[in-house]
Amino acid sequence: LKDINFTFEEGKIYGLLGRNGAGKTTLFNCLNRDLKVDSGSFYIDTNGVRREVSADDIGYVLSTPTVPEFLTGREFLKFFMDINEKSLKNPKSIDEYFDYMSIEPEDRDKLLKDYSHGMKNKMQMLINIIAQPNILLLDEPLTSLDVVVAEEMKQLLRSLKQDRITIFSTHIMDLALDLCDEIVLLNHGVLEVVEKTDLDSREFKDKIIAALREEGNE
C-alpha cells in the first residue's frame, strides 16, 4: 500500500476489487489495527468532529468464520452481549437476534462446531450487527455460501448500510456490481473509484476489467 488518500461516505456499500496480492486484506488489517501502518492515520467524522478511527469503530467479517466452537449459538450471543453490555445501543433479546438472521429455534442451542459454514457466517455477521460498528469490513464474506444464504446476506447488507461505511472486498465482479453502490479498485497500492457516469452495465464491467488488466501488465 502507498499514498492511500481516500474518503468513504456512510450509507454506501463500496466494492473493493483488485487482483490477487493487490493488498485488499492488508488494507483491512491496517484499518482493524491488526497491522501497524508505517505512516499516516485513518480518520472518521462523527457528528461533525474528526477523530482517529478506533477499534470500537470497526466490525470485521472474514471469509472463514471464526467462532468459539465449544459454545452453543445462544451461549456465544449471551457472552458477547454480556461483555459489551455498556456499549450496546437498544439491544434486543437473544431470540429476536436469532429471528433476525433466520436461525431456526432448533439450531440455537447447538454447539457452534456443528453449525454449517453458512450458519457460522451468519453468527459472525450477527455479532457485528449487535455491535453496530461505524465501519463494517467484509473480506469475501459470501465465499462458499449456498445460493439461498448468499441472497439472504446480500439483502441484510443492503438493509444495514445506512449510518455506517461498508467496504466489501471480493474477487467476484458480478457480485460487486449487484450489491455495491460504488466500485473502488486497489491499483498499485492506491485506491481509485471507477466512474460509472453514462455507462451501461456491460461498458462499466469492461472498464473495470481493463483497469485490472492494466494493473497486471505494469
Predicted regions and their residues:
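Conserved ABC transporter NBD signature motif
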Residues: 40-54
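The feature captures the beta-strand-to-loop junction immediately N-terminal to the Walker
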Residues: 17-19
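Q-loop/switch helix immediately C-terminal to the Walker
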Residues: 64, 70-84
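Helix N-cap at the start of a conserved alpha-helix in ABC-type nucleotide-binding domains
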Residues: 147-149
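Conserved ABC ATPase "signature" C-loop
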Residues: 188-189
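Catalytic Walker B motif of ABC-type/P-loop ATPase nucleotide-binding domains
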Residues: 136-140
